[in-house]
Amino acid sequence: MRKTKIICTMGPSTDKDDVMEQLVREGMDVARFNFSHGPHDEQRGRIQKLRELRKKYDRPVAALLDTKGPEIRLGCFKDGKVSLEEGQIFTFTNKDIEGTNEHVSITYKELYKDVQPGGHILVDDGLVDLEVQDISGKDIVCKVINAGVIGDKKGVNVPGANLKMPFISKKDHEDLLFGIQEGFDFVAASFTRTADDIREVRKILKDNGGEEIQIIAKIENQQGVDNIDEIIEAADGIMIARGDMGVEIPPEYVPVIQQKIIQKVYTAGKPVITATQMLDSMISHPRPTRAEATDVANAIFQGTSATMLSGETAAGKYPVQALQMMSRIAEHMEENIEYNTIFKKTDRNENPDITNAIAHATCLTAIDLKAQAILAVTKSGSTAHMMSKHRPGCLIGACTSSERVLRQLNLSWGVYPMLIREEYSSEILCLRAIEAAQKHKLVKVGDTVVFAGGVPLGIPGRTNMIRVCIVD
């Protein structure tokens, strides 16, 4: 059974026929809804369909709302696009004008305050590079470094600039309220720069009844990388969004940044997602390149909790095949990981509390006894997250009475979430956990399982008991 979780992005391709249903059947763990595209009515139809499929297949597929975030875009051109030549002068202005091959408006009107001569402005994922020559009033005068064609509303990146633009736009605020109303499990906060950005999102969620929604910080610029420690502490998980990161930051730096962030988040006992262009060629082709397969495998080897498919499932020709391929790569990689070695290297001192100590002891017991599974009863999910951090090798059956926590646990590496009702006796609770594991075919008669729970029961953060049981 695959331990690495897979996120699939919803879009036009998943709207066709029974594609979303096939993705659920083939093991999609989290469905990502990209709110940079598609109105609320369109997204509402998709989340409703997902709810129906959860019920039909009894699978706790989580729903993730990915915000548009504080992005910068060009205005529109008179003819829809212009061709820029190397060496020519081109101006970005905060005036609302029709674009020509000499100038264009920009959505962030205060950008002229945040850039300096010598800095660079990149358009359309970095395909066109312009160097800032002068700030003339509120206009940014640039010289074209790389020639190319730019068109209406193309994205703009400003590497190295400390942008002061608001983190939550009016659209993002409306999308968050929509996410609360529709019962989303996660919010992915795009272009997270500081811990304050996460706190701002959390306040909106809490003030509007969405305090149970977990926040995934998307790291995709230098500010986010520089402030990664405080962001990890404030967020519930991290997404390494390598698309914009590879534009904002030199591409040769991205692999090392990815490795370091995965290690930091992994050590903190929180989920970490590696995203963007993982099987990008499968948008158009039925098989990935060897480099893409290696990229997925390398992220798993580094310790990622989940890998993500973006355009491959949202707009590609082979969405189901992309999920199947990513799943096969993950399963084969997991067969070749030395879990005992990883466990010995896990630093317990990063989180010196009762939950982490119990999680470590439970995993150690499971390794020593070669247990078939760990069964953890968890109210908030924190115990299962910590056990996932230790990579015990065996599956972690996480039992919870909360349907929201059930789905959120589906993002954690090696965790198989199961729904059980609350009990007020540790004996009965252990029995219910084993029954659930048997029902889901995690264990069979004669298997050794290690059970972890809390007394008194039902209180988050109170896991303090370990038991070894033989299934009978």
What are the language-model segments listed below?
Residues M1-D472:
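Non-catalytic helical/linker scaffolds that mediate oligomerization, partner binding
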